[in-house]
Amino acid sequence: MGYGNIMNVETTGASWQTAQQDKLGYSGVRASHTMANTDSGRMERYRSKINSVGAKYGIDPALIAAIISEESRAGNVLHDGWGDYDSNRGAYNAWGLMQVDVNPNGGGHTARGAWDSEEHLSQGAEILVYFIGRIRNKFPGWNTEQQLKGGIAAYNMGDGNVHSYDNVDGRTTGGDYSNDVVARAQWYKTQKGF
């Protein structure tokens, strides 16, 4: 794929905080793999759409599956397609399997398509590609896999919050977003053939 090989991206996996979603007694790559496995049955419902969108945008389908797993647990934590309820706004901040940020003070995107549609997955992939490009421009000295990891972190919290490779997840959800997503993607690639 044109954005780097997900299998060559360094990862420390899920933080303790993220692993507590599933009440795991451990963190790291093992925890990310366990959570990806938990979501794998639901993920199969979306395999053909994921593969189609991956081919269309040059994104490894395993990475799309991993973002879906991390963001919405393959749809399991959504409420009529919505997630990340903001009590201050009295509204949800994110839409669909890939949790596209619709908060006007956040990503400000307009939700496209049904929450589990190929149109929605395409929107998520476009946002990811945009952020990978932003990170490539911001950090031209990083190798392709580092730029991919930075783009994944930026998908979660914007490229303005990525300041260094060593602390790429410093401002991400759980302090581990790109590391968790990469570990899940590696699992989906090797264990489920995405």
UniProtKB/Swiss-Prot annotation:
<comment type="similarity">
    <text>Belongs to the glycosyl hydrolase 23 family.</text>
</comment>
<dbReference type="GO" id="GO:0003796">
    <property type="term" value="F:lysozyme activity"/>
</dbReference>
<feature type="active site">
    <location>
        <position position="71"/>
    </location>
</feature>
<dbReference type="InterPro" id="IPR008258">
    <property type="entry name" value="Transglycosylase_SLT_dom_1"/>
</dbReference>
<protein>
    <recommendedName>
        <fullName>Lysozyme g</fullName>
        <ecNumber>3.2.1.17</ecNumber>
    </recommendedName>
</protein>
<comment type="function">
    <text>Has lytic activity against M.lysodeikticus, V.alginolyticus from Epinephelus fario, V.vulnificus from culture water, A.hydrophila from soft-shell turtle, A.hydrophila from goldfish and V.parahaemolyticus, P.fluorescens and V.fluvialis from culture water.</text>
</comment>
<dbReference type="GO" id="GO:0005576">
    <property type="term" value="C:extracellular region"/>
</dbReference>
<dbReference type="InterPro" id="IPR023346">
    <property type="entry name" value="Lysozyme-like_dom_sf"/>
</dbReference>
<keyword id="KW-0929">Antimicrobial</keyword>
<dbReference type="GO" id="GO:0050830">
    <property type="term" value="P:defense response to Gram-positive bacterium"/>
</dbReference>
<keyword id="KW-0378">Hydrolase</keyword>
<dbReference type="Pfam" id="PF01464">
    <property type="entry name" value="SLT"/>
</dbReference>
<keyword id="KW-0081">Bacteriolytic enzyme</keyword>
<dbReference type="InterPro" id="IPR002152">
    <property type="entry name" value="Glyco_hydro_23"/>
</dbReference>
<dbReference type="GO" id="GO:0009253">
    <property type="term" value="P:peptidoglycan catabolic process"/>
</dbReference>
<feature type="active site">
    <location>
        <position position="84"/>
    </location>
</feature>
<dbReference type="GO" id="GO:0031640">
    <property type="term" value="P:killing of cells of another organism"/>
</dbReference>
<keyword id="KW-0326">Glycosidase</keyword>
